[in-house]
């Protein structure tokens, strides 16, 4: 199983209410995509730390992740929710199954 997490820095004009909307939209929209096994998203607790918003999604494999990336729901979510509100991102992928060679994730 692949755990994909993206950390985001937000544009200065993004309000706490907008962050709440982003969280709800992520859960409601991205869970419609068949390749998504689970999703978590949230806002930072400590305002002193960078990366005030994150989305984490589990996929069966990197192949499933690639299918997800091309899904029209994901493309629309990126265009309408993420791009207008974020200034920077950091994406990380992790293999969750012990003993599995990451070359075959």
Residue ranges and their predicted role:
Residues 3-9, 42-71:
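Short, well-ordered beta-strand segments in beta-rich or mixed alpha/beta enzyme
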Residues 11-13, 60-62, 97-99:
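Generic structural motif
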Residues 12, 35, 47, 70, ...:
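Generic structural "secondary-structure junction" signal
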Residues 14-20, 64-67:
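Short, conserved charged micro-motifs
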Residues 18-23, 75:
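Long, contiguous binding/interaction regions
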Residues 31-36, 58-92:
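An amphipathic, aromatic/His-enriched active-site/gating alpha helix that lines ligand/cofactor pockets
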Residues 40-49, 79-105:
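Glycine-rich beta-strand-turn "strand-cap" elements at beta-sheet edges
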């Amino acid at each position: 199983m692949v755990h994909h997490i993206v950390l985001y820095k937000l544009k200065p004009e993004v309000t706490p209410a907008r962050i709440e909307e982003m969280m709800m939209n992520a859960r409601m929209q991205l869970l419609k995509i068949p390749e998504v096994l689970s999703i978590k998203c949230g806002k930072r607790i400590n305002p002193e730390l960078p990366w005030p918003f994150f989305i984490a999604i589990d996929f069966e494999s990197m192949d499933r992740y690639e299918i997800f990336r091309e899904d029209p729901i994901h493309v629309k979510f990126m265009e309408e929710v993420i791009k207008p509100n974020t200034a920077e991102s950091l994406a990380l992928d992790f293999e969750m199954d012990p003993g599995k060679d990451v070359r075959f994730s």
